[in-house]
Every structure is written in C-alpha cells, then in structure tokens.
Amino acid sequence: MQTISTLSQLSINSDSRVLVFMPHPDDEAVFCSGFLKKLTSNNIPVKLITLTSGEKSTLVFSLEPGDDLAATRRIEQKNSCEILGITDYEILSIPDGGLKLKETEVKEIITRQINIFKPTHVISLEPDGIYGHPDHIGLSKFVSEVVTSPINLLYVTIPEFEKKRPVSKMSEKSVINPIIPEFCLELKNTETEAKIASLRAHRTQFGLFDTSSQNFGFFKATKLLNSEYFTYR
C-alpha cells in the first residue's frame, strides 16, 4: 500500500471530474469525506449521488418523537455536503435495504448521471461493501457493471486491520474480504476537521459520545479518522 497525500498521486488533476455514488446518507462521511473535502478545496468538480434516504436505519440518536427519519437524514446529508463544500448532490428514493432488488432502475440512474456529469472518475464502495451490507454490495456491483473505460473506477475500501473485526449484523455475508487498498490517502488537519464535522452533521447516526474528541473509537480502530483508502479497479 502506497501512502500518499495529494490528489495527483491518485491521478486526479484540474481536468478531472469526480462522480461519487453512495448507498446511504453518512456513507460519504464515514469512508471518503476527507477525500471529498480535498477535491472541493482544489476546485475539482464533484457530484455526490446518494441512492437511498436511509430510512431503515436502527440508529435514531437525537431524533425527536414524531420526526420522520428519512426527511431528517436528507437534511443531515445536505448539512454534510455544505461542510464538505459539495454543491452538486442528489438524494434519491431507492428503498433502503432493497437496493439490490432495483437493478434496472439503479443502473439507469448510474448511466444517466454519467451521461449528465461526464466524469473522468467514478467513486463507489468496494465489491464486498466494506462490511457486507446488501445495499453496499448491490451498488458496488451495479456501478462496476455500468462504468467502462475511459472512465476510471476508484473503489473506497478499508485497511487490512478492519478485516479481522467482527462482521456487522447488517452483513449478508458470514465472511467479508474487502479489497486491499492500493493507496492510503493522508488527510490534512483541515480535512480531518471537516470529516469530523461531516460525521457530526449526521446526528441521528452518530451519538455525541461516538464523535467526541475523547472517543472516535470506531474511526480510530478502522484508521479512518486521519486517512482514507482507495483501490483502482
């Protein structure tokens, strides 16, 4: 794995256009918000497509009685994008937990967004969906099948350390094997600060303790607080 600190080391430059597909609100914050902040800080066009509203999440920190989780998570995503400097984004309404059952619709969305935005690079989760979530796996599969040369497909992944951790209860697999990263992208302090703020914007998904400066246990354990991980297809 090569440790890098600049976009040029990922073959992304001022002529690049980066289109990002994520399954749920907060996936961008967890896995690539530092990278996204690096893109916008360098004035590289970026568009974020979130396929679902995340309405099936079992995490409801700070959700007031009577509040609609999907609507709340859409607002959280908007706030996260503002923090990251992303002005071009869409939050779609593919059913949370049912993305794999919508292959034709999702592939049409991916194709349409590629035709509209004309990216040089497409970003999505690696084929095992990081931790086996069926929506993650489905989106990665559909993106991988639609994206063809000359567009570059860059997978977000995790360091090998994480593979030894227990599989999430949301996983549809008993064993997961995320792609080994080619690149460890080190984040500047300002990018880490933006990542923390982006995570905190998703208030229903991350309790204050989870994102307190004294804790961040998950992100320290997965080495995702100060670095993010990528592999080209």
Kindly label every feature range from the protein language model.
Residues Q2-L19, L101-R233:
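Metal-dependent de-N-acetylase/amidase catalytic core
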Residues M1-K118, E145:
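Active-site rim/loop-helix segments in enzyme catalytic domains that contact anionic ligands
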